[in-house]
Amino acid sequence: MRILFIADPLEHFKIYKDTTFAMMEEAHRRGHAISFAEAHQLSVEGGRLQVDACDLAVTDERPDWYKLGPKLRQPLTAFSAVVMRKDPPFDMEYLYASQLFTLAEAQGVKVFTSGQALRDFNEKLAILHFPELISPTLISGEAHRLRAFVNQHQDVILKPLDSMGGDSIFRVKPDDPNLSVIIETITWRGKRTVMAQRYIPEIRDGDKRILVIDGVPVDHCLARIPAAGETRGNLAAGGRGEARPLSARDREIAETVGPELKKRGILLAGLDVIGNYLTEVNVTSPTCFREIMDQTGVNVAGLYIDALERRCQH
């Protein structure tokens, strides 16, 4: 197989924990040909999707873990699979890339995750498809509605719809002297829609990342435990990752969401679960492969490449 990875610049990879690197390393180990490009290197000419991509060889050297060939313009149809691994935010450039992927798919290119799914499954809003699994939630940009929600539930998390890694997340209460300015700031004075969720105290025990590959949950999750004094469990916000077997409730959530993900063509998703509640469905570039692999010995990257190979054979 020829696999094109579209991702952020390689020099930014932290390979000791990078999921895209784990995917590349496993694909390379199996003898697949790997190419790399950034999203801005996609183009359309004469109605055909093209990309300025480099062949990539994974090496055993550190820190120089890759070698790149010359940059060549080639059609996306030249690749067995295109794997989109660019990190959020899902801004206009991300939207344009997803639209180009939809055009490519119409020309027979296999894209993971599909352009349509990237557009339809906003990582914060996707949980609304599963109302029975979520804590009380409000989507709004209106200050009076957000304040009323805070007054009703007393302890609330506010977060934007387009962030990642715990960025711009606030925990607020009705008597917070900064509540008004926090609402003004996060909503851009009512010009931006945000999510409000009732605070789930089980975050103290960890915000669990459950990986779902081709509709099937990986048997271990990664509990991301907040640092002292922190509300956020995200590893990017200083949380500590601890691999754990799925609980019965974790599996129930994953097996409820998994079939819908598969139906929509989402090969890989990261479900975020706090306590008994689903809080996010990450589909752009889910992480935590490496942490689970290192702590359990389970080859999560192998499970992903297995699924990719199956999809490309059909």
UniProtKB/Swiss-Prot annotation:
The EC number(s) this enzyme carries: 6.3.2.3
Pathway(s) it belongs to: Sulfur metabolism; glutathione biosynthesis; glutathione from L-cysteine and L-glutamate: step 2/2
Signal peptide positions (record): none
Alphabetized PROSITE patterns for the sequence: ATP_GRASP
Key words, A-Z: ATP-binding, Glutathione biosynthesis, Ligase, Magnesium, Manganese, Metal-binding, Nucleotide-binding
A Pfam family reported for this protein in Swiss-Prot or TrEMBL: GSH-S_N
The protein, known as: Glutathione synthetase
